[in-house]
Swiss-Prot record:
A Gene Ontology biological process term: protein import into chloroplast stroma
Gene this chain is encoded by: TOC75
Membrane topology according to the record: Multi-pass membrane protein
Spans within the Cytoplasmic topological domain: 157-164, 242-254, 373-417, 444-449, 481-507, 570-577, 702-713, 792-805
Role according to the record: Mediates the insertion of proteins targeted to the outer membrane of chloroplasts. Required for the import of protein precursors into chloroplasts. Forms the voltage-dependent preprotein translocation channels (hydrophilic beta barrel) of the TOC complex in the chloroplastic outer membrane.
Free-text comment about domains: Transmembrane regions consist mainly of membrane-spanning sided beta-sheets, which are not predicted by sequence analysis tools.
Keyword Membrane: yes
Name the record gives this protein: Protein TOC75, chloroplastic
Keywords: Chloroplast, Membrane, Plastid, Plastid outer membrane, Protein transport, Transit peptide, Transmembrane, Transmembrane beta strand, Transport
Transit peptide: 1-31, 32-135
Family that this chain belongs to: Belongs to the TOC75 family.
Subunit and interaction comment: Part of the TOC core complex that includes a protein for the specific recognition of transit peptides surrounded by a ring composed of four proteins forming translocation channels, and four to five GTP-binding proteins providing energy. This core complex can interact with components of the TIC complex to form a larger import complex. Chloroplastic protein precursors also interact with these complexes.
Length: 817
């Protein structure tokens, strides 16, 4: 009786007695073993542990096979160098080759039985499970000579059960090759199916178990293991085989069987009558076809299916080697796309026109959160789960297939909360739902309250320019933070700073800020708005009132701002956000004696000071009060490619005066900044890959319509404006335009770069009250060019001031763009 269809099942079974099923009108001993992927998809350095693959019709043997397949995949992935640090945390999981086997086998022959046999399991699972034969590690250097005449063939049954045999040679002999048979080379995928290794030491029972595994795995029509006595006392082994072959197929179907329940099994009784056997096989056929119809289609794209069909058309019949190549090809696509838990667990409908490839894709069934203390003990966390859960990408939620890219994104998103010192995202098999994946997220929370004190010392020159003991001034900053209030990621941050703690009233500055995220509720994931309010007192040196390059140094003017700010930030995407709010502040201008300063001043040739400079405030009294609306739109698509910033960034800011305050100020200030980082050599992103060559293009425009106090005029010159000039050295104006270009060339894991920059006031300096650009003899425009090198966080640059034609060396911290 010929069978209409057959199936190959791959289960994580240890080698055991071979099972025989009736197929093709004869009794067939089915056996198969799995090979590692030939596409380098297995994690580097991961040991290829053996998995036995056997045919079975027992439901008990098939139960849990899909869970085992996923466990094997996750184990291999976790050992595959895909541990991603995130604030000290890591991401368990990675890509591997055929990451274990098992899973999904169901019937005895799957609707036709025979040939491929039965119970659930994994065709390739022997790579990661306990294998049939392992070298005795304790006695690997202590083995027994065979004690037989040299160069005679020795059946395994004739070996002594008391000896440990050293294997010096392993060969494969294909009986069907070339008509009379031929030895195959290491490139043959069958080489990877055995666990025996030359140089290993094995007992007779281990060798017999290896043979039984090969016999029972379904890959061979016939297989035998024979030894040859070597003169040095070792054994050479030859595996002679005839691979299994099925009829030609013209169609290929891929289904996801990950969460499908196991079918009820009925043992195939060899004592059945012919009619009972026929009824049994028909029932298996109906059950399997119903299973195929009820399965979800796999996510394998059409072009990969077409490639598999092309592989099938090149061969007249479906062979075990062809199925290995199909398995490798399918799993390679899954693993390359980040679906590291996907496993090919079965090929069904063999001996028909359509081959069915069953895949356990790694469906996520649930997400679990675990909090740990500093010692790794599980504790009750302070952070509310919805705060973390809303940061998970959609692809990492139940109902989706586990993907390592989604795991990386989850790490990045959760880390952006700044609530945890350690984050781990680990997939594991679901023990309650066979074939499912549980995403396990382990978190270590930061201390909610913290305080910090930092000190600094400054020396003020005394008489005759020499410092004295009394001129030493202690300064410092006291800061505190209470984060994650009520577990809702709300926080209060404060700091107090003074450069002279002996007389802190001279320059005491402070900031107190409250942040309230999820303004529309934690559960509303369609909106992400954060409310922030702060009160502040700051002091900065104004670059508006500085002397030009051909003047003596002008007396400095300090700008104090004390006020209140409240705004709402709405995140449209992780790259785009919109901030809008209200600012109320009092601005006071002071001279170096801390007295209120109403006008700028400059040194006269006589040594005196000219006090008729531009007014420092809009009111002319040295004190302004105003309220204005402020909005900011940021679109940042930059990313790090091997340590270099690539992408584009756009920032638009608008300040709108309300006519409230000193002299009823009404104005519109606007700024637009565009920066693009171009990957010139299209360097791909990846660990260990070199830095890309980068071209930076930058432009900045700012303008003001309406009332414009001098302290808010736009200045030209400085390390973040036009390099090579001092802060404000080129001018202060109502409108400015800056353009810059920088070419970065990677040299030994750092950058050497050249740049050119230009800035102009567009002729608007005269429109600033008192014209500080003219008063301080500045030109209103300037260019520079130079070369630089990055030394860690420091930029060393040689810059030519194009206005004066002189060059200067600068060292700066941070980035220009």
């Amino acid at each position: 009786m010929a069978l209409t269809s057959q199936s190959l099942f791959f289960s994580p079974l240890a080698a055991g007695p071979s099972r025989r099923v009736r197929g093709r009108g004869r009794s067939t001993s089915v056996s198969a073993a799995a090979s590692a992927s030939s596409h380098n998809s297995q994690p580097h350095g991961h040991p290829q542990q053996p998995l036995a693959v056997a045919s079975s019709s027992s439901k008990s043997e098939s139960k849990g096979s899909k869970t085992f397949a996923l466990a094997s995949a996750i184990t291999a992935a976790a050992s595959g160098a895909f541990l991603l640090a995130s604030s000290g945390g890591g991401f368990g999981g990675g890509a591997g080759g055929p990451l274990g086997g098992g899973g999904g086998g169901w019937g005895a022959g799957g609707g036709g039985g025979g040939g491929g046999g039965g119970g659930g399991g994994g065709f390739w699972s022997r790579i990661f499970s306990g294998g049939a034969a392992h070298a005795d590690e304790k006695s690997s250097g202590d083995w027994d000579p065979h004690g037989l005449p040299a160069n005679i063939n020795v059946p395994m049954t004739k070996l002594s059960g008391l000896k440990r045999y050293k294997i010096s040679e392993l060969k494969f002999f294909d009986r069907a090759a070339g008509g009379g048979g031929a030895f195959t080379g290491p490139e043959d995928s069958f080489f990877e199916m055995v666990t025996l290794q030359p140089g290993g030491v094995y007992t007779k029972s281990q060798l017999l178990k290896e043979l039984e595994t090969l016999v029972s795995c379904g890959m061979f029509e016939r297989v035998d293991l024979e030894g040859k006595a070597k003169p040095d006392g070792t054994l050479g082994l030859t595996v002679s085989f005839v691979e299994s072959v099925w009829s030609a197929a013209k169609q290929f179907k891929c289904i996801n069987v990950g969460l499908m329940s196991q079918s009820g099994q009925v043992d195939f009784d060899q004592d059945m009558t012919e009619r009972e056997k026929m009824d049994y096989l028909r029932k298996q056929e109906r059950d399997y076809q119903q299973r195929v119809r009820g399965a979800k289609p796999c996510i394998l794209p059409d072009n990969v299916r077409g490639e598999v069909l092309g592989m099938m058309k090149k061969q007249e019949k479906v062979s075990a080697r062809l199925l290995q190549r199909i398995r490798d090809h399918v799993q390679k696509w899954y693993h390359n796309e980040g679906f590291v838990c996907a496993q090919v667990v079965n090929f069904g409908n063999l001996n028909t026109s359509e081959v069915v490839c069953e895949v356990v894709e790694g469906d996520i069934t649930k997400v679990e959160y675990q909090f740990q203390d500093k010692l790794g003990n599980f504790v009750e966390g302070n952070t509310q789960i919805p705060i973390i859960d809303r940061e998970l990408p959609q692809q990492l939620r139940p109902g989706h297939i586990f993907n390592i890219g989604a795991g990386k994104q989850a790490l990045k998103n959760i880390n952006s909360l700044a609530l945890f010192s350690n984050i781990e995202v680990n997939p594991r098999p679901d023990e309650t739902k066979e074939g499912g994946i549980v995403v396990e997220i382990k978190l270590k929370e930061l201390e909610p309250k913290s305080a910090e004190v930092s000190t600094e010392w400054s020396i003020v020159p005394g008489r005759e320019g020499r410092p004295t003991l009394a001129s030493i001034q202690p300064g410092g900053t006291v800061s505190f933070e209470h984060r994650n209030i009520y577990g809702l990621n709300r926080s209060i941050v404060g700091s107090v700073t003074s450069s002279n703690l002996l007389n802190p009233q001279d320059d005491l500055s402070f900031k107190l800020e409250y942040v309230h995220p999820y303004l529309d509720g934690v559960d509303d994931r369609n909106k992400n708005r954060t409310f922030k309010t702060s009160c502040f007192n700051t002091r900065k040196l104004s670059p508006v009132f500085v002397a030009g390059p051909n003047m003596d140094e002008a007396p400095p003017v300090w700008v104090d701002r004390v006020g209140f700010k409240a705004n709402i930030t709405e995140s449209f995407t992780r790259q785009s956000k919109f901030t809008y709010g209200l600012v109320v502040e009092e601005i006071t201008t002071r001279d170096e004696t801390n007295s209120i300063c109403t006008h700028g001043s400059r040194a006269m040739p006589s040594g005196g000071l000219s006090m008729d400079g531009p007014p420092t405030t809009l009111s002319g009294t040295g004190i302004d009060r105003m309220a204005f609306l402020q909005a900011n739109i940021t679109r940042d698509n930059t990313e790090f490619v091997n340590g270099a910033v690539i992408g584009d960034r756009c920032i638009f800011q608008l300040d709108q005066g309300l006519g409230i305050g000193s002299k009823n100020p009404f104005f519109n200030r606007h700024q637009l900044t565009l920066t693009k980082f171009v990957n010139l050599n299209k360097q791909e992103k990846g660990a260990g890959k070199p830095l890309p060559a980068v071209l930076v293009l930058h432009g900045h425009y700012a303008g003001c319509v309406g009332d414009l106090p001098s302290y808010d005029a736009f200045t030209l010159g400085g390390p973040y404006s036009v390099r090579g000039y001092g802060m404000g050295e080129l001018g202060a104006s109502r409108n400015v335009l800056e353009v810059a270009s920088e070419l970065r060339i990677p040299v030994r894991n750092t950058y050497v770069y050249g740049f050119v920059e230009h800035g102009t006031d567009l002729g608007s300096s005269k429109d600033v009250k008192g014209n500080p650009t003219e008063f301080f003899r500045r030109v209103g425009h300037g260019s520079s060019y130079g070369l630089g090198v990055k030394l860690g966080l420091v930029r060393g640059e040689y810059i030519v001031d194009h206005n004066a034609g002189t060059g200067t060396v600068f060292f700066r911290f941070g980035e220009r763009f």
